[in-house]
């Protein structure tokens, strides 16, 4: 009789909620994992690569215009859109037999120099299609209760449609209507000088005045 072994587990993202009080704003994704071997899974050292599948949703003309700097000429959307990497997260999945649930904490950023943040900021409503690509190591109890180890196949993935309102709500709650761009030190110094020369209240006001 051949010994039972853990095959490829199945993952499904079943929900998301914001966590605005952490040092870095987080989206907490609830993930269900299923294993049909019937063996006790001690833990899974799991890594998830999370990407935005921008080609899996439709865009109205106004949104196409906002995305033009990211994907090129608006008329070519969605032909020019491709996946955008959001981040890579790791976790230790708790012990389970048959099925279990765990949380993936994904840090988010309002830095508009990041393609994923710029994309999400451009979406007024609807959902953002995500793909979670999983890999890692499974530790489980063999038929004789000895520790066995196997790998999570690279083919394991899950899709989820993130409500855009969740992302916008978390950014608004954490950053109060602000976005962020990176500027060279020389550019910041020029802004500082202009602020002093014009007697302006802030760098934000200085940039707004320069753009008029």
Predicted features along the sequence, with ranges:
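Short aromatic-acidic-glycine turn motif
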Residues: 51-62
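Contiguous beta-strand segments within globular domains
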Residues: 20-33, 42-50, 106-110
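Short, basic amphipathic alpha-helical segments that act as recognition/interaction helices
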Residues: 201-212
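Surface-exposed, Lys/Arg-rich phosphate-binding patches that contact polyanionic backbones
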Residues: 185-202
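Internal, hydrophobic beta-strand segments that form the core of beta-sheet-rich folds
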Residues: 47-53, 101-154
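Low-complexity, acidic Ser/Thr/Pro/Gly-rich terminal tails and inter-domain linkers that flank the onset
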Residues: 1-28
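Extended, solvent-exposed segments with strong compositional bias
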Residues: 66-122
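Short beta-strand elements
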Residues: 65-74, 139-180
């Amino acid at each position: 009789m051949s010994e039972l072994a853990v095959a490829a587990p199945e993952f499904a993202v079943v929900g998301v909620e914001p966590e605005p009080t952490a040092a870095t704003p987080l989206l907490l994704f609830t993930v269900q994992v299923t294993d049909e071997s019937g063996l006790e899974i001690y833990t899974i050292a799991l890594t998830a690569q999370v990407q935005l599948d921008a080609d899996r949703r439709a865009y109205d003309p106004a949104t196409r215009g906002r995305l033009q700097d990211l994907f090129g000429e608006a008329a070519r959307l969605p032909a020019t859109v491709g996946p955008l990497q959001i981040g890579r997260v790791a976790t230790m999945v708790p012990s389970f037999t048959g099925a279990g649930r765990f949380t993936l904490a994904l840090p988010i950023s309002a830095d508009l120099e990041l393609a994923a943040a710029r994309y999400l900021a451009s979406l007024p409503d609807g959902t953002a299609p995500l793909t979670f690509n999983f890999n890692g190591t499974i530790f489980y109890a063999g038929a004789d209760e000895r520790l066995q180890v196997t790998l999570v196949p690279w083919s394991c993935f899950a899709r989820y449609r993130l409500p855009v309102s969740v992302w916008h709500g978390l950014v608004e709650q954490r950053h109060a209507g602000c976005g962020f761009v990176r500027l060279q030190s020389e550019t910041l110094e020029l802004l500082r000088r202009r602020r002093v020369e014009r007697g302006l209240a802030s760098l934000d006001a200085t940039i707004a005045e320069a753009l008029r």
